[in-house]
Regions:
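Exposed alpha-helical structural elements
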Residues: 5, 21-25, 77-78, 132, ...
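Short pre-active-site segment immediately N-terminal to the catalytic Zn-binding motif
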Residues: 66-83, 99-100
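Long, well-structured alpha-helical subdomains associated
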Residues: 119-169
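Hydrophobic core segments within long, regular secondary-structure runs in both alpha-
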Residues: 81-84, 110, 114, 138
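Auxiliary, metal-adjacent structural segments of Zn-dependent hydrolase domains
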Residues: 2-63, 72, 120-122
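Short glycine-rich, low-complexity/disordered patches
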Residues: 28, 35-39, 97-98, 104, ...
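Active-site recognition of the HExxH zinc-binding catalytic motif
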Residues: 81-94
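Post-HExxH zinc-binding segment in Zn-dependent metallohydrolases
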Residues: 95, 101-134
Length: 169
């Protein structure tokens, strides 16, 4: 993947205020598309230093990924991981694949941001963001309920997350 070329394309989209088109270009370039994806829409920006993306739609129905207009003001590796996180939610909410429990969906998505098992083409983020995303994964694991079936199902992945966090500087 030629990141320099991708950045040039994204800059051109930004110059013409074509943020939604830039996002479509990104998911196409990194093979993140899915039939349950209904498209992108805008959500309110949080701040110049933080962003929030969401996948919105009923479980089992098409999902719209809501992005802030300043999405492409952030580091491309971080943006790709954030978009991949939401595109995993698109898959998790697809007919025939619905994962009902929000804590399970979020744990899977944050785990993916660390280990890239579903989307190996997505680059790694900084150690700072790995620690942050690892912490979020553990938070959602805890919310599954102490000793629950879900916690048992994801015990091995939880250990992987803890190991990764502990190995980071």
């Amino acid at each position: 993947m030629n990141f320099e070329q991708i950045n040039l394309h994204l800059e051109a989209y930004k110059e013409h205020d074509q943020i939604l088109d830039a996002a479509k270009y990104l998911i196409h370039s990194f093979d993140l598309e899915h039939e349950n994806f209904a498209g992108f829409g805008f959500r309110q920006e949080l701040s110049p230093t933080s962003m929030l993306l969401t996948a919105e739609g009923d479980l089992g129905g098409p999902q719209t990924v809501m992005i802030p207009r300043n999405l492409f003001d952030f580091d491309l590796n971080l943006v790709l991981n954030m978009v991949a996180h939401e595109m995993l939610h698109v898959r998790q909410k697809a007919p025939g694949n619905v994962i009902e429990d929000k804590n399970e969906r979020e744990f899977q998505a944050y785990y993916e941001m660390l280990f890239h098992k579903v989307f190996p083409q997505i680059p790694e983020v900084s150690d700072f963001h790995k620690k942050f995303f690892g912490g979020k994964a553990l938070e959602y694991y805890k919310r599954m309920g102490e000793g629950s079936m879900l916690q048992q199902k994801y015990a091995e992945q939880k250990t992987e997350v803890e190991h990764l966090i502990n190995e980071l500087p």
